[in-house]
């Protein structure tokens, strides 16, 4: 016959095993989803900015654009130049290029900053050399873009050193280099 102490131990063991079996493991996808929600929440707390706006938020926007390699001044005034740069950023990140900075554009800027730290240009060049060889020179505008599948890539022109030494342009072609290491030639 089972003692009271044994029954309590079996109940505790069963409960612990059930909790472990049915707990949701933390995966990279779950962590990324949680992180994305934090970025979106932060983005929603900032104001919508458009041409004619002027504030410290505009200054922050301009600095963020500059940090991710979009050429704009940082003066706190949302003028035509800032609007055009915002449209470039939106186009590069598969957003509607309306020149208005709302939650989606703020979130894309925040995400771009994080992705640039995780996937620097130097890593992309390493992937490119591995694929195309060490005799290739890569040039880029350092902008991290998004493709139709929301995958981040840098756009490079690849040039052959020997061809340049012989007086030619050396251009082999334009390539998209992804965080995964994929090197895809750009089609026209």
Please annotate each region the language model reported.
Residues 2-6, 17, 24-73, 114-122, ...:
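Acidic, Ser/Thr/Pro/Gly-enriched interdomain connector segments
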Residues 11-21:
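Bacterial N-terminal signal peptides
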Residues 50-60, 66-110:
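Short acidic, glycine/serine/threonine-rich helix-capping segments at coil-helix boundaries
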Residues 91, 157-161, 187-188:
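Secondary-structure transition/turn motif
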Residues 100, 155, 184-186:
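Structural recognition of the beta-strand scaffold that forms the well-ordered cores
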Residues 117-144:
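N-terminal export/targeting and maturation segments
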Residues 139-177:
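Exposed beta-strand-loop-beta-strand "reactive/processing" segments of non-cytosolic proteins
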Residues 176-188:
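Short, low-complexity, Pro/Ser/Thr/Gly-rich segments in the mature regions of secreted, periplasmic
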């Amino acid at each position: 016959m089972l003692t009271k102490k044994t029954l309590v131990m079996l109940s505790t063991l069963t409960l612990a095993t059930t909790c472990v079996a049915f707990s949701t493991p933390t995966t990279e996808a779950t962590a990324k989803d949680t992180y994305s929600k934090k970025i979106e929440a932060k983005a929603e707390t900032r104001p919508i900015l458009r041409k004619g706006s002027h504030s410290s938020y505009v200054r922050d926007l301009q600095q963020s654009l500059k940090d991710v390699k979009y050429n704009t001044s940082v003066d706190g005034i949302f003028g035509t130049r800032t609007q055009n740069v915002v449209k470039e950023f939106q186009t590069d990140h598969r957003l509607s290029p309306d020149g208005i900075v709302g939650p989606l554009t703020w979130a894309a800027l925040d995400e771009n900053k994080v992705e640039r730290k995780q996937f620097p240009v130097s890593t992309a060049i390493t992937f490119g050399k591995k694929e195309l060889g060490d005799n290739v020179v890569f040039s880029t505008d350092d902008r991290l873009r998004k493709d139709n599948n929301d995958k981040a890539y840098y756009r490079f022109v690849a040039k052959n050193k020997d061809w340049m030494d012989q007086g030619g342009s050396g251009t082999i072609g334009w390539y998209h280099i992804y965080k995964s290491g994929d090197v895809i030639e750009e089609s026209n």
